[in-house]
Amino acid sequence: MGINYSTVGEMKEGSYIVIDGEPCRVVEVTKAKTGKHGSAKANIIAVSIFTGAKKTLMAPVDSTVEVPIIEKRMGQVISNVGDKVQIMDLETYETFEIDMPTEEDVASKIKKDAEVEYWEVMGRKKIVRVK
């Protein structure tokens, strides 16, 4: 998986950004023009996709930031062992283990043979929803 580049000024709520090496979803963007000769600054508040931790970024509007490439795929649950879920990709038929999602509404629906949507972001995988 990879990373694209964008400017801070193009970020808006709901977009994705990499802050401190962690892929995050932007929840709030505020822009402020500083004094007479200063460039505009943006304050971005984002939540980590994997940990749920809140992260902030303060940078000039014209500076470059990393945007993660999110690959959305479908898989089928093969087994559910404690805090790990074994999934088979429905296109490539490869099998792998993913950590059990922390969201209770998603975790409660995971059972054998259920179809799930998972995201692969920067080499890490996460179950997002159950069909």
Swiss-Prot record:
Cellular compartments annotated: Cytoplasm
CDD domains membership: S1_aIF5A
GO cellular component, one term: cytoplasm
InterPro entries registered for this protein in UniProt: IF5A-like, IF5A-like_N, NA-bd_OB-fold, Rib_uL2_dom2, Trans_elong_IF5A_hypusine_site, Transl_elong_IF5A_arc, Transl_elong_IF5A_C, Translation_prot_SH3-like_sf
Main location (coarse class): cytoplasm
Key word Protein biosynthesis present: yes
Key words of the record: Cytoplasm, Hypusine, Initiation factor, Protein biosynthesis
Top-level taxon of the source organism: Archaea
Job of this protein: Functions by promoting the formation of the first peptide bond.
Family to which the UniProt record says this protein belongs: Belongs to the eIF-5A family.
Protein name: Translation initiation factor 5A
